Amino acid sequence: MHEQYQPLEIETQAQNYWKEHQSFLVRELPDKEKFYCLSMFPYPSGKLHMGHVRNYTIGDVISRYHRMQGRNVLQPMGWDAFGMPAENAAMKNNVAPAAWTYDNIAYMKSQLDSLGLAIDWTREVTTCKPDYYRWEQWLFTRLFEKGVIYRKNGTVNWDPVDQTVLANEQVIDGRGWRSGALIEKREIPMYYFKITAYAEELLESLDNLPGWPEQVKTMQRNWIGKSRGMEIAFPYDQASIGHAGQLKVFTTRPDTLMGATYVAVAAEHPLATQAAQNDPQLQAFIDECKRGGVAEADIATQEKKGLATSLFVEHPLTGDKLPVWVANYVLMNYGEGAVMAVPGHDERDFEFANKYGLPIRQVIARVEGENDFEPTVWKEWYGAKDESVRTVNSGKYDDLGYQAAFDAIGADLEAKGLGQARTQFRLRDWGISRQRYWGCPIPIIHCDACGDVPVPAEQLPVVLPEDVVPDGAGSPLAKMPEFYECSCPKCGQPAKRETDTMDTFVESSWYFARYACPQFEGGMLDKKAADYWLPVDQYIGGIEHAILHLLYARFFHKLMRDEGLVGSDEPFRNLLTQGMVVADTYYRTTANGGKDWFNPADVEVERDAKAKVVGARLKSDGQPVEIGGTEKMSKSKNNGVDPQSMIDQYGADTCRLFMMFASPPDMSLEWSDAGVEGANRFLRRVWRLAHAHVSAGLPGALDGASLSDAQKQVRRAIHLAIRQASQDVGQHHKFNTAIAAVMTLMNVLEKAPSQDAQDRALLQEGLETVVLLLAPITPHICHVLWEQLGHAEAVIDARWPVVDESALVQDTLQLVVQVNGKLRGHIDVAASASREDVEAAARANENVLRFTEGLSIRKVIVVPGKLVNIVAN
């Protein structure tokens, strides 16, 4: 055993052992309890960042801990390999996205290996490979035939120069991110998953996920957005519109119907189209609306604009004529593309009515307090629907609470055939068509005679050609007759293959299930294997995936269940959302007002007595730089630390130890070079103590029955550490406090005597405990130390240590003694001492006698096992 800790040598040795012995290969073992631990798989962007390292280390610690508990542990890894960044990189470097992606995968896989992750690589999935996406295509065809997937026109951002559809985030200030062209809204045919058919179940079954953070469940509940309301029909005013008909709106506030003063429709609504025929100003406004963003978030923040039409509808209860406006905040794909406006009691309508001088009618008043309704100043209570308000100015519906008004107005609308109660969801069907190249081809053939025909199972997969370099102008597949020319599977006539590809969220919605049977060729899943491993016992990933990915994965799991592929209802039993990795930022302001960001490694900092950074200068020129505070590591702020350079300098175990010690996993982790140094120093201490112990020769067995009091204290420290770490790692995932417990134990072991055989046997137990408790966190050093401590089996196959309760029993206790709440001394008493004995010992303490001299002792408070407080005056 080397005297010095040499991480590179140690880590190579451990990793070679795991490879040779296939230590992480797992099979289904029906008689053994399974544990499936999964970290969200990475996008192969080129190299790992610290966020990846943290995510995968957390998963690895949990996996290794459960293996030490005797469970059959699966920890797989794969690559979320389709997507826009590959196309962008391909255009930039003039290389096919496939080649770029596979190169990145090879490099990142070597990085993951260097971290020492206990991954079963035989189960690796790569989502851009046909053997993976073929089953996605198969499920698509099944769901299309069942009507769970359908085709309809959808509104998209169209770049007229690049002739392509842009994602919302690619539209910057109304222009295309690449071409700079003004973006148009266009209607194009797209495929949709009918996720709304599962909205109720997706909402209800959140209650069956006690192992999920409440915050994530709340975000999903809000996204699904169940609301009870009414669909209300406003009859057309035939004099202005020219024909009979109804304008339908959904509202959660039918109780305020008597306050409706106008209606607003989306730019794409048929009434808007009709009104614009002889109104060039309105047509120009509609065109402007169509150019705007299609994202809900954009619409929420943009300025509310509208234009009146010459059309009217009738109020369903009073018959009053209400003007029809076209407004940019009404979305065609929400409800029927129309809203009833009650400016007195809806903040958005209130702003709009004040802007355009529309009437504002109060129909709700406060029950108590001042009824201070002002039509020019919005107040929070205007929108209330609780017991604090009642209806007013509503004729026969006056003086009713929200529910009573809802029911009374609803009943009258239903009687007139102009309303019906309805539950609506904010959730929209999931449009998955992408006019992109680097994605999974949609398995549909368009035939003039037969319509949209799913590709038959025996003709799957529809393979994406991999030798294409996109140019950014439209989809390359649409320009490749060799891809799209085909014959119809039904009638045999010439037909055209679909050239859109699927949203990349589809691949990440079922990968967790394919890991159970990645080589299975008989179907999407081998049900027996899938039911053995699923659901995932512990899923780990960032909170930013709380809605889309986690909702789509839950939806897909239910689709697979309904196809008979899996037996469970939910994919992930427990969810851990890890915090971000943050680091200091430094910059200089440029002449044009921009910022040049400098990497922390290139900056020298000056700290105050509390180690706070108070000054910074660039190493290269010695000139000051501004301190920007701590932010998430990112390329844009140039504050990332390359994991590879850290591993090369200190070893993977140091990086892993720092990551787990610096912060609880669900909190942000602040990068600190001093913290990394500290972690490395601690591992060197462990190595040094073990080296000294092993060099003196391994001891015989410990005789627990004949320990001295001092030895009992050492053994107690060992088992206190086991108890603490078992709770922290096993129950709470507080790896930082588990490591702190091991550090406390190390302090005891370093000071413990090693003269006689019992001392050395006790040190052996202490070092073995340190190694076992650290094994999930720093597996390489523990692999070597376990072997050096005389064990034939590898630590990867060792069991987690068990607390010996008898070691925690104390013969004597040391108690704190206070006089009037101030510390005045300590006393040693027998663990079995009575309250009277404890009080007598405290009163006899010489310091107590000194501080109570001339005073009367009023009472003595004894907190068993902790302290005695003597109150005297």
Swiss-Prot record:
<dbReference type="InterPro" id="IPR001412">
    <property type="entry name" value="aa-tRNA-synth_I_CS"/>
</dbReference>
<dbReference type="InterPro" id="IPR009008">
    <property type="entry name" value="Val/Leu/Ile-tRNA-synth_edit"/>
</dbReference>
<dbReference type="GO" id="GO:0002161">
    <property type="term" value="F:aminoacyl-tRNA deacylase activity"/>
</dbReference>
<dbReference type="GO" id="GO:0005829">
    <property type="term" value="C:cytosol"/>
</dbReference>
<feature type="binding site">
    <location>
        <position position="635"/>
    </location>
    <ligand>
        <name>ATP</name>
    </ligand>
</feature>
<feature type="short sequence motif" description="'KMSKS' region">
    <location>
        <begin position="632"/>
        <end position="636"/>
    </location>
</feature>
<protein>
    <recommendedName>
        <fullName>Leucine--tRNA ligase</fullName>
        <ecNumber>6.1.1.4</ecNumber>
    </recommendedName>
</protein>
<dbReference type="InterPro" id="IPR002300">
    <property type="entry name" value="aa-tRNA-synth_Ia"/>
</dbReference>
<dbReference type="GO" id="GO:0006429">
    <property type="term" value="P:leucyl-tRNA aminoacylation"/>
</dbReference>
<dbReference type="InterPro" id="IPR015413">
    <property type="entry name" value="Methionyl/Leucyl_tRNA_Synth"/>
</dbReference>
<keyword id="KW-0963">Cytoplasm</keyword>
<dbReference type="Pfam" id="PF13603">
    <property type="entry name" value="tRNA-synt_1_2"/>
</dbReference>
<keyword id="KW-0067">ATP-binding</keyword>
<dbReference type="Pfam" id="PF08264">
    <property type="entry name" value="Anticodon_1"/>
</dbReference>
<dbReference type="Pfam" id="PF09334">
    <property type="entry name" value="tRNA-synt_1g"/>
</dbReference>
<comment type="similarity">
    <text>Belongs to the class-I aminoacyl-tRNA synthetase family.</text>
</comment>
<dbReference type="InterPro" id="IPR002302">
    <property type="entry name" value="Leu-tRNA-ligase"/>
</dbReference>
<dbReference type="InterPro" id="IPR013155">
    <property type="entry name" value="M/V/L/I-tRNA-synth_anticd-bd"/>
</dbReference>
<dbReference type="Pfam" id="PF00133">
    <property type="entry name" value="tRNA-synt_1"/>
</dbReference>
<dbReference type="InterPro" id="IPR025709">
    <property type="entry name" value="Leu_tRNA-synth_edit"/>
</dbReference>
<dbReference type="GO" id="GO:0004823">
    <property type="term" value="F:leucine-tRNA ligase activity"/>
</dbReference>
<dbReference type="InterPro" id="IPR014729">
    <property type="entry name" value="Rossmann-like_a/b/a_fold"/>
</dbReference>
<feature type="region of interest" description="Disordered">
    <location>
        <begin position="624"/>
        <end position="643"/>
    </location>
</feature>
<dbReference type="InterPro" id="IPR009080">
    <property type="entry name" value="tRNAsynth_Ia_anticodon-bd"/>
</dbReference>
<keyword id="KW-0547">Nucleotide-binding</keyword>
<dbReference type="GO" id="GO:0005524">
    <property type="term" value="F:ATP binding"/>
</dbReference>
<keyword id="KW-0648">Protein biosynthesis</keyword>
<feature type="short sequence motif" description="'HIGH' region">
    <location>
        <begin position="42"/>
        <end position="52"/>
    </location>
</feature>
<keyword id="KW-0436">Ligase</keyword>
<keyword id="KW-0030">Aminoacyl-tRNA synthetase</keyword>
